[in-house]
């Protein structure tokens, strides 16, 4: 068995005296592990840092085996990001999120979204909002996507300012007003589909905090609580730095 793909490094662990088990989020083969012989050498260590993108050749005798990787660099982001606390916590949180995906289950759209996020993790003006959007995409990839396209009560697609914590569907201002204390806020940047260059506005810290509150609620309900886990520390630190909460 053999394939060649590109992959984002999301983790590694020691194996034997000189090797590592490398965990990649690949474009076409999903989250995939493999043994890298000599992965702990001085030559290999800089390449195998989380956040880097590699060209990987995976080989195994059987499809279900761990197999081994031969890797070469494509984009080495780790050295660029290591000077930013926001980026370091962002890489840690992104890796934790991607590990929620079933192993070897392809998610090419999530892979591409992760690459966009990695490219901007050291830009505090946009990285937090991109992370909120990635969390929404991950929820959808896990089968817990939110419907923010129209009001759950009226079917209208304007003045959407709330999300129902029960259904995960958007609610308009008028329909939600009597129940506003029981609804989650839907910040403008999550309901606006405009892209940079066509009237897009960078969300402020308040909007981003509301976005993280929204995604955090559903991640807790559907992901962390069923696994008896707390909110990852990397997420808490990233949110604090990204929204001006020291």
Curated annotation (Swiss-Prot):
DNA damage found in the keyword field: yes
Cystines in this chain: none
UniProtKB keywords: DNA damage, DNA recombination, DNA repair
Stored InterPro entries: ARFGAP/RecO, DNA_rep/recomb_RecO_N, NA-bd_OB-fold, RecO, RecO_C
Protein name: DNA repair protein RecO
Chain's role: Involved in DNA repair and RecF pathway recombination.
Recorded name of the encoding gene: recO
Keyword flag DNA repair: yes
Species the sequence originates in: Methylorubrum populi (strain ATCC BAA-705 / NCIMB 13946 / BJ001)
GO cellular component: bacterial nucleoid
Family statement: Belongs to the RecO family.
Pfam families per the UniProt record, alphabetical: RecO_C, RecO_N
NCBIfam families noted in UniProt: reco
GO biological process: DNA recombination; double-strand break repair
